[in-house]
């Protein structure tokens, strides 16, 4: 028999009780810690997908990258309700489409900051610069007065005549946006008109419309693509190269135009006649109030704003008119009553109620900008939900406009604006301290261009092709997918003062 002291099994069995507690304690602690985190996150009072030990944030951010911001917001609100918690880049993010909550965010200074990828915003020049996505509240406050002054007062009145003139001039040279088969690229036409009007009021130098419009489109694509990308994306140079080049291309073009403006200002005799938006910025730089980078980015953002959003909005309006000729008839009767045979003037604007309601209903039914992105600067409570400092906020105003108040929320109908609509239920431009600084001039521009166009155009639809047939991409904003036949129209002369606009199918 083997002595007990020499039996190797004795050593093995005696070691197991001593080693097991030491080996399992860290594992047990880790499991308990993860369980506590999981249990804490899962019991959040805010509806939304679960945290699931970090898997939830990865999935939600991935959904934004895959579906686009607008589509992802609609998905989460439809799935979980009108106040939803998700994550973007690991940061807690609330998606809100409830009017009372949206009103609270817009109203308070606590939400004047934006959010987005730092590296992405740096690439396009918007990080702590310009006005659109400047997430430095102190610097944004210094920049905003330049935009406010340019977009109000005398500039607001001048823009009406500029829009009328530009629309007429561009209708007289449709061949520049006409294809070989005679179809007109109406979206490109609207972009050219918007760029021309912006240039005449804010910059005032000669430019190549076709080239700049293309550069603006590429810049917007880069902005939309990079806004929420994770940092690792920017470490792979071949992935972001084309976006960096697109941003650099437009910024370089703007630098050249601004230098032309500087040269022009140095030779004029009376500065008062040339004190536009760009001039104010240049003189602010000369005083040391702004840097050259500030000036370049502010001019760039002023020049891209209308071609980026208002052009698509007007394009959609033409499609909606084509789908419902009775709407055109109502507007034409009002236009003839208010204006007669003359062109639209500033005094006419308050009297064009049907035209105004049509614009509002178009923006409600098919918004181009249907979300607003903000960041909480301090802890807060919104409709009973706690909001921590640094929380991202996305206001899904496009969905909000179809949930409350309107009698026919899912239809395009002028009846939705026959009665006065309380501001809390309809905010296409936002309001409050960070509301759209150009909302008043935007309405003036859309009215002036639409009225001038309708006085010369009749809009008809062929083969029942409507807005629902057009493929759209809903990311940072809603844009029709380019290069599809339904984006083209045929303009044929019908009478001396009117042109027929016919939407066609190339197939």
Swiss-Prot record:
One Gene Ontology cellular component term attached to this UniProt record is: membrane
Coiled-coil-forming residues are none
Name any Gene Ontology BP term: response to estradiol
Entry keywords, A to Z: Heme, Iron, Lipid metabolism, Membrane, Metal-binding, Monooxygenase, Oxidoreductase
Similarity comment: family membership: Belongs to the cytochrome P450 family.
Q: Its function?
A: Catalyzes the formation of aromatic C18 estrogens from C19 androgens.
Name under which the protein is recorded: Aromatase
Species: Gallus gallus
């Amino acid at each position: 028999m083997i002595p007990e002291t020499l039996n190797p099994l004795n050593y093995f069995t005696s070691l197991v009780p001593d080693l097991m507690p030491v080996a399992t304690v860290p594992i047990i602690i880790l499991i308990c810690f993860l369980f506590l985190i999981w249990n804490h996150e899962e019991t959040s009072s805010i509806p939304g997908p679960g945290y699931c030990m970090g898997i939830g944030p990865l999935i939600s951010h991935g959904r934004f990258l895959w579906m686009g911001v607008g589509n992802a917001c609609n998905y989460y609100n439809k799935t979980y309700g009108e106040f939803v918690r998700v994550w973007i880049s690991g940061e807690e993010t609330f998606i809100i489409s409830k009017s009372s909550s949206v009103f609270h965010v817009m109203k308070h200074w606590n939400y004047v900051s934006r959010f987005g990828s730092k590296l992405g915003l740096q690439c396009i020049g918007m990080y702590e610069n310009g006005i659109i996505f400047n997430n430095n509240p102190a610097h944004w406050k210094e920049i905003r007065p330049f935009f406010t002054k340019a977009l109000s007062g005398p500039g607001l009145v001048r823009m009406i005549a500029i829009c009328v003139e530009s629309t007429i001039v561009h209708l007289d040279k449709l061949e520049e946006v006409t294809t070989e088969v005679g179809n007109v690229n109406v979206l490109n036409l609207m972009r050219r008109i918007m760029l021309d009007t912006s240039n005449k009021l804010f910059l005032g130098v000669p430019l190549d419309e076709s080239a700049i419009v293309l550069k603006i489109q590429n810049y917007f694509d880069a902005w939309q693509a990079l806004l929420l990308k994770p940092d690792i994306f920017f470490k792979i140079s071949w992935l972001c190269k084309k976006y960096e080049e697109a941003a650099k291309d437009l910024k370089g073009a703007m630098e050249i135009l601004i230098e032309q403006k500087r040269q022009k200002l140095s030779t004029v005799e009376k500065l008062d006649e040339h004190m536009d938006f760009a001039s104010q910025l240049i003189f602010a730089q000369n005083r040391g109030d702004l840097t050259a980078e500030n000036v370049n980015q502010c001019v760039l953002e002023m020049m891209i704003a209308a071609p980026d959003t208002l052009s698509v909005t007007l394009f959609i309006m033409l499609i909606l008119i084509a789908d419902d000729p009775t709407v055109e008839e109502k507007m034409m009767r009002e236009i003839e009553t208010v204006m007669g045979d003359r062109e639209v003037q500033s005094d006419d604007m308050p009297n064009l109620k049907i035209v105004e309601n049509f614009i509002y209903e178009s923006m409600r039914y098919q918004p181009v900008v249907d979300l607003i992105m903000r960041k909480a600067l301090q802890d807060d409570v919104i409709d009973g939900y706690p909001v921590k400092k640094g929380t991202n906020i996305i206001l899904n105003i496009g969905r909000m406009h179809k949930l409350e108040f309107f009698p026919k929320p899912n239809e395009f109908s002028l009846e939705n604006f026959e009665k006065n609509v309380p501001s809390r239920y309809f905010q296409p431009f936002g309001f409050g301290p960070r509301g759209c600084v150009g909302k008043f001039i935007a309405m003036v521009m859309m009215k002036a261009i639409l009225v001038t166009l309708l006085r010369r155009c009749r809009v008809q639809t062929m083969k029942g092709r409507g807005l629902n047939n057009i493929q759209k991409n809903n990311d940072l904003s809603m844009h029709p997918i380019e290069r599809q036949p339904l984006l083209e129209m045929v303009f044929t002369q019908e009478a001396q003062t009117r042109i027929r606009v016919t939407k066609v199918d190339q197939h």
